[in-house]
């Protein structure tokens, strides 16, 4: 962002996405100074901590739901409604594969499932206003959040990699490529869709009862059963 700030057409604003008043102030202050707002990416959210339901407080639940789902709702309400009035725009909401499959991050999974449903609903509401609304559901992605540099002991990523048919982490570049595509005119007929960018994680979930994923060796598919 430091480099981009030097560009004449780049601006940064700080606001709390769960505060509708703050977002409205940003819109009202800059809508006449900036070019037409034509794109919105809702990606803000607090990192979840895996816990059992018995160990999850109401405050912890609310914090995750607010940051991932309520923040997306308010951002879409403020900026998406503005796009609808101007009959032009594209919105990309960030969901997750956990929005489809359960995991020990209860509030996070519920919030990301809600983002998928919200995306579908808004895409229908604003279709005739020429505002497209889609979502991206990333899988395990190589970010500092997953393996921070300050971690003394390197995290064993083997269980994660073994759950991905491509046997690797997604990159932020791959996720951003999908986001840019959905914001562009190249996806002009796509709305109400959630694109999974997960290396096949969700598609491969049903293979584990049969021994796991196939490998490259001939006749070595794990689902092969000897007589």
For each feature predicted by the language model, list its residue ranges.
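Alpha-helical segment proximal to the catalytic Tyr-Lys
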Residues: 81, 124-128, 188
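Active-site loop of short-chain dehydrogenase/reductase
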Residues: 35-38, 83-95, 128-131, 193
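C-terminal substrate-recognition "lid" of short-chain dehydrogenase/reductases
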Residues: 73-76, 88, 168-197, 202
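The beta1-alpha1 cofactor-binding region of Rossmann-like NAD(H)/NADP(H)-dependent oxidoreductases
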Residues: 15-25, 58, 173
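Catalytic loop of short-chain dehydrogenase/reductase
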Residues: 92-114, 119-128, 140-141
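Short C-terminal tail/terminal secondary-structure segment
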Residues: 50, 180, 191-227
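Substrate-binding pocket helix/loop in short-chain dehydrogenase/reductase
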Residues: 51-53, 60-62, 160
């Amino acid at each position: 962002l430091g480099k981009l700030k030097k560009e004449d057409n780049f601006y940064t604003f700080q606001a709390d996405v769960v505060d509708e008043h703050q977002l409205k102030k940003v819109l009202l202050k800059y809508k006449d100074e900036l070019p037409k707002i034509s794109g919105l990416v809702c990606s803000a959210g607090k990192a979840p901590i895996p816990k059992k339901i018995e160990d999850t407080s109401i405050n912890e639940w609310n914090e995750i739901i607010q940051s991932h789902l309520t923040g997306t709702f308010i951002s879409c309400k403020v900026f998406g409604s503005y796009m609808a009035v101007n009959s032009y725009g594209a919105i990309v909401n960030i969901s997750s594969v956990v929005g489809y499959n359960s995991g020990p991050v209860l509030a996070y999974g519920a919030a990301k499932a809600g983002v998928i449903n919200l995306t579908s609903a808004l895409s229908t509401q604003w279709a005739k206003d020429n505002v497209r609304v889609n979502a991206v559901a990333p899988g395990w992605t190589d970010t500092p959040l997953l393996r921070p540099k300050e971690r003394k002991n390197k995290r064993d990523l083997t269980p994660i990699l073994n759950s991905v048919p491509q046997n690797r982490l997604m990159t932020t570049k791959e996720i951003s490529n999908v986001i840019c595509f959905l914001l562009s005119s190249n996806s002009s007929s796509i709305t109400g869709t959630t694109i999974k960018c997960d290396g096949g994680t969700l598609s491969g979930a049903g293979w584990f009862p049969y021994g796991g994923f196939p490998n490259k060796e001939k006749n070595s598919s794990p689902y092969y059963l000897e007589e």
